[in-house]
Swiss-Prot record:
Motif YXXM motif 6: positions: 828-831
Extent of motif YXXM motif 7: 921-924
Name of the encoding gene: IRS4
Protein name stated in the entry: Insulin receptor substrate 4
Comp. bias intervals (Low complexity): 510-524, 800-810
Keyword RNA-binding among record annotations: no
Stretches the record annotates as Disordered: 406-653, 678-921, 1179-1257
PROSITE patterns the UniProt entry points to: IRS_PTB, PH_DOMAIN
GO molecular function: insulin receptor binding; phosphatidylinositol 3-kinase binding
Amino acid sequence: MASCSFTRDQATRRLRGAAAAAAAALAAVVTTPLLSSGTPTALIGTGSSCPGAMWLSTATGSRSDSESEEEDLPVGEEVCKRGYLRKQKHGHRRYFVLKLETADAPARLEYYENARKFRHSVRAAAAAAAAAASGAAIPPLIPPRRVITLYQCFSVSQRADARYRHLIALFTQDEYFAMVAENESEQESWYLLLSRLILESKRRRCGTLGAQPDGEPAALAAAAAAEPPFYKDVWQVIVKPRGLGHRKELSGVFRLCLTDEEVVFVRLNTEVASVVVQLLSIRRCGHSEQYFFLEVGRSTVIGPGELWMQVDDCVVAQNMHELFLEKMRALCADEYRARCRSYSISIGAHLLTLLSARRHLGLVPLEPGGWLRRSRFEQFCHLRAIGDGEDEMLFTRRFVTPSEPVAHSRRGRLHLPRGRRSRRAVSVPASFFRRLAPSPARPRHPAEAPNNGARLSSEVSGSGSGNFGEEGNPQGKEDQEGSGGDYMPMNNWGSGNGRGSGGGQGSNGQGSSSHSSGGNQCSGEGQGSRGGQGSNGQGSGGNQCSRDGQGTAGGHGSGGGQRPGGGHGSGGGQGPGDGHGSGGGKNSGGGKGSGSGKGSDGDGERGKSLKKRSYFGKLTQSKQQQMPPPPPPPPPPPPAGGTGGKGKSGGRFRLYFCVDRGATKECKEAKEVKDAEIPEGAARGPHRARAFDEDEDDPYVPMRPGVATPLVSSSDYMPMAPQNVSASKKRHSRSPFEDSRGYMMMFPRVSPPPAPSPPKAPDTNKEDDSKDNDSESDYMFMAPGAGAIPKNPRNPQGGSSSKSWSSYFSLPNPFRSSPLGQNDNSEYVPMLPGKFLGRGLDKEVSYNWDPKDAASKPSGEGSFSKPGDGGSPSKPSDHEPPKNKAKRPNRLSFITKGYKIKPKPQKPTHEQREADSSSDYVNMDFTKRESNTPAPSTQGLPDSWGIIAEPRQSAFSNYVNVEFGVPFPNPANDLSDLLRAIPRANPLSLDSARWPLPPLPLSATGSNAIEEEGDYIEVIFNSAMTPAMALADSAIRYDAETGRIYVVDPFSECCMDISLSPSRCSEPPPVARLLQEEEQERRRPQSRSQSFFAAARAAVSAFPTDSLERDLSPSSAPAVASAAEPTLALSQVVAAASALAAAPGIGAAAAAAGFDSASARWFQPVANAADAEAVRGAQDVAGGSNPGAHNPSANLARGDNQAGGAAAAAAAPEPPPRSRRVPRPPEREDSDNDDDTHVRMDFARRDNQFDSPKRGR
């Protein structure tokens, strides 16, 4: 008994000692820091570390009721926090214990089924420790239900879902474990402890815990790189396989991590980011039910597209959406605008897209899943006040409302989201421009109410950043100097057709500094009492508002709030005060910045434009200081723009024109009559906020060529200005530029280029001259129609007119008949013997042309009349002599190119230019049918070749002088073709035509043949004044079966059908007939000239037809090689075929040479001029026009000159045996099934005339 009691007392004392030790350890925990001191833990997104007091109170207090029951329970020094939490999945209540890291165990989170299990676990642990100390048997321990090692966790986050409001989401390596707290304080407590323990555990594992980096930047950067990743806002999402998730193979389970500047996608079981997306690269985000989506831009590593993610429920998706928007707004508030370099075009383009998207917001397309997208920034964006910084505006879908004031650092900035591109002008309320008007140095006039209900409209339809001069306010210069970087203050931008704010004018009547010649001016509301700017008016032609006769563009103000004395603007923009309205800045849309910022003293320095970075990477420097003097005599002040600064933009901007779709002609006429009835000096009442008037829903602005000084080099760029028609001139029912159907007729602009000058070295300051104004531009700059073509073009510098006319003549005939004064409906193209037109004014190397044609070289091909000539474009006159008429292109160039079809012609090299200078041309001159055309003359032509010219006196005559200057002894030289064709035609030319060709067989070319570079041939119909401009490849089609070349205008229903055969399949094309005759030619001994034409036929045989299966016999190669003559290139053959189609008289020469003029029409070279006279006498040839004749030599003697005909017949060789003829079927009306207008050129017709155009069925 005594021994038993002694043993029991000893165990009791041992237990008491253990309890005392546990109490001491607990006291030590209370009085000492729980965690080792180190670098403060900064949570990403918070910027602050966890307070140490929270640790102290959390470790000792904040216990639940279950903990208070067992306060005397020794839990050990490693327990940091314990309490009841619920599991998210099923809502089961579990007892969670957070333990610190010890020497034998890492930091961990454990949970038990209840507190009683935890107590038993603690007692079992104590008993095990005692047993281990005494050497007794160790009782079994009670393990927890789960242990989560914290250093292996990815992150922890707070959130809420549809069921629970206070969630603690713990992300392990491979799963997502969420706990539910009872209240917000409990949630915050657990989150702070977990986040700090996770981060310190990771640091300890990485060896960075307690490391104090030096102050050196390299050490700080190294420490930051070694810092383990930790994210505050994390969601586990399932990326759906749609959009980018499908294209980039991003579908699956990801951790979506949001920081202050970026979004990171991390896969399971790793901490390395898979995709990193900058927040500024996100175009929009939204949610629908349990789906959250992001639309990213092209600056991301995965490219543009959408990412659709599935989350727990709709509440989580909504919270994600709100948090993303909050981060985006924070970036905007912190002036983080790196995206300006990535895809924002300019401030003006931002405003354009924002305003234009207003009309289309009601038609938001559905997403692939069927949900509507929520626009970024909750479908609104911040518009900061530009000059005064009074308040901020939130530009919503339908209205503009003021918001909270903004900091001074945000003043002068405009941040707009990227929206859809649209070129339609829309209107905004007056409050928008009232807040945009900079007026820091000007007090508000007492008579001006803060809200006068005035509506301002702004037409902004350009796509670039125009630059304007500074206003007269003292702070304008400071605003420009202080706004560096990627931003452009609103008082410096202009876009295309107008400027939205004209604020900052003083009270001394100075000129407007914000008018752009492309459109209307809308000035701010708070002008001075004597300011010359209309506060809310608008020019009816899209021009300057005016209050005191200040309209720089001549347009009368039409808005409310004008002074009674205002109204019609002075012609040059001169204000009644002392401010110029015609100086300064530049407009991106293609006009002069008229009235752009001359101060009261006319200081030109204020007109300097501040250049900013834009989407196109660069903008040209202002050239208004480099303006050349105007040519004598100087024109009067123009009504459409100032004389300072070139209206040229950078980056190859396009010139857009609005299309009048909505308003009818009756509405226009009624509007014109109504505007004409209003007196000029009367003030008009406020109108509703439309772009132009309340009757028209379409903001159409008639355009005309702007006033510009001659450019340094000839250019395709045309400064444009609105067609300003005053009220007294608007009584006519229709614009002079509209045709009978109500369409605005646009024609290529013509501005006089400077005189010929030698090429200059490239100037680095004028790099845009070579890019924006190069002749290889893809765009043809247009001007409105009929009246713009002068009857007597003036060119004070003696140079030729613009090169853009060749692009105009490539248009279909219905688009070119009206402005030239041709009232007939004939599609026939008469021609006149042409002249060479030099290329000295072009940027290309001029080719060698005959000096005797210099006298006949025209000085210009037509140009628009300058406004200085009377202020209105002149009209053509049918009674003027032909020398005063607008000339037409007179050269058709046939060139062969290489293997590939190039979509855009490159600039020719020096070798290519030298090769082109000696290439073969067909010169045509187009003139009126009534003109008296002299017969073609053969004087001065080479004696080595005869000229066959037979001018027949009929409506379709005046044929052709054709000269083949073929240097037989020198195969290196090309042929020189000169085709002078019949008069009176609508010119029909093609910019470019390409079709594939098989390679030319060696047996057909001979040893001295000119080798072609590839399998393609390029036929270019082009003016001598204009380099080649490629059409779309799909616009030219060749049908090998029918032998037709279809030239289809992609913008109309017109089509030109150049037929090489009379029918589809019944008769072989001319090339096939040539191949049939070639069999006969091979059996005959070939003379020098005949071998030449045999080689020509062999070259033509490369043309793609159905007869290409025939292989040329090698027997013709030795004959060709022995002749030592170059083969007739396909360009010459096509030129010859074109000539024969228009000149049936040359068929006599072909018949005299022994060829069938109906099946194969070729030229017969003659020895000298006498032989040419002999051949001219042969008009009717049995082998050609008379198929039944069997004696061509006898028929040759029936001409006018019997002796010459006999001589030619005696010298002519025997004709070859006639091949099998295929009967010509009758022409069918419904041969073409398309409903297009065809101009059919049949090279196989016997009557050698064109078919009249007919409408296909």
